[in-house]
């Protein structure tokens, strides 16, 4: 007796639904990998769980973005709006421009120049000479600025030295003034006790 046909409908029990999703998901990914290897097919798989988690698989020979682009071209269905297409074109343009600049930089460094013709080599030579002129000009600006700064520092040093000398002279002058005042004060103190004796001697002479 054969198995009865299982009705396909939403599993109400949350735990059973999670278990079934995990099993069926793993089975789908396994089948996608098998058909990729067995049939040399380009396979992509994207699954979104009920909780929003994404599970994806893409064959090793092509990334998912390239596969979606191929799908869009072959099916005629637009997966991206005009804004995204313009953005994609801008990215491609910037990438090509970057590759061109990288190649030009290698040429300026003397690399990969075997394929250049005479006209291109002359253009590279002109670019190098122009770059050298700009480097020399900037180098001269730095040297002039350095000398100017050194001159300013020397002038500041001279002014500081002069101010220091003036301060030292003022301190020395103040010290000499204090020493002279101290000396005068000591002399007046010694003479003071002698003055009464002189007055007594003068008085005795007057009386005699």
UniProtKB/Swiss-Prot annotation:
GO BP terms in the entry: cell differentiation; positive regulation of transcription by RNA polymerase II; specification of floral organ identity
Effect caused by changing residue 75 to P: In strain: cv. Kent
InterPro entries hit by this protein: MADS-box/MEF2_TF, MEF2-like_N, TF_Kbox, TF_MADSbox, TF_MADSbox_sf
GO molecular function: DNA binding; DNA-binding transcription factor activity; protein dimerization activity; RNA polymerase II transcription regulatory region sequence-specific DNA binding; transcription cis-regulatory region binding
Effect of residue 73 to M: In strain: cv. Co-1
Residue span, MADS-box domain: 3-57
A GO term from the CC aspect: cytoplasm
Name of the featured protein: Floral homeotic protein PISTILLATA
Organism from which the protein derives: Arabidopsis thaliana
Other information: Mutations in PI cause transformation of petals into sepals and stamina into carpels.
Consequence the record notes for mutating residue 125 to G: In strain: cv. Gr-3
């Amino acid at each position: 007796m054969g198995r009865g046909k299982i009705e396909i409908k939403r599993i109400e029990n949350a735990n059973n639904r999670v278990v079934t999703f995990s099993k069926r998901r793993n089975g789908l990914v396994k089948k996608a990998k098998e058909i990729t290897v067995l049939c040399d097919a380009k396979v992509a798989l994207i699954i979104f769980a009920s909780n929003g988690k994404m599970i994806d698989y893409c064959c090793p020979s092509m990334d998912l973005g390239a596969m979606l682009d191929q799908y869009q071209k072959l099916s005629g269905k637009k997966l991206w709006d005009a804004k995204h297409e313009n953005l994609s074109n801008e990215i491609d343009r910037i990438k090509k421009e970057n590759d061109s600049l990288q190649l030009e930089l290698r040429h300026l460094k003397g690399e990969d120049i075997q394929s250049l013709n005479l006209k291109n080599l002359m253009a590279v030579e002109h670019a190098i000479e122009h770059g050298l002129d700009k480097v020399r000009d900037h180098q001269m600006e730095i040297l002039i600025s350095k000398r100017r700064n050194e001159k300013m520092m020397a002038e500041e040093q001279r002014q500081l030295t002069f101010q220091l000398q003036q301060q030292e002279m003022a301190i020395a002058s103040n010290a000499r003034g204090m020493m002279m005042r101290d000396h005068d004060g000591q002399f007046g103190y010694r003479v003071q006790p002698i003055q009464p004796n002189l007055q007594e001697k003068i008085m005795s002479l007057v009386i005699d």
